[in-house]
A protein has these predicted regions:
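P-loop NTP-binding site
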Residues: 1-94
Length: 94
């Protein structure tokens, strides 16, 4: 199962990494682009339990793709982890 999200606010690096690590064991991979507070736009890659960030060109809005190891069952833990870390509903699409 592959899911997508867009987001239109800068995020804190520590918050984004904590969110990704909370769901890492249920994902094959996650990749996207976020505006990181204090760092600007970053390409974000999650493989296993490793989160890598590297500078990238500015985007219109943040976006991320999640590739699930557990099929559609990823939706509930993914949205719950986002709510816990960011304090708002996750703008998830499938």
């Amino acid at each position: 199962k592959t899911l997508f999200m867009n987001y239109d606010k800068p995020v804190e690096e520590q918050t984004l990494c904590a969110f990704l690590l909370d769901v890492a064991d249920s994902l094959l991979r996650a990749k996207g682009f976020f505006e990181i507070a204090g760092k600007g736009w970053q390409q974000v890659d999650l493989v296993g339990r490793r989160v890598d960030l590297k500078p990238c060109e500015p985007k219109e809005k943040a976006e991320m793709v999640f590739i699930s190891k557990i099929g559609p069952a990823i939706i509930r833990p993914l949205t719950a982890a986002w709510q816990q870390h960011f304090g708002e509903p996750m703008p998830l699409k499938n």
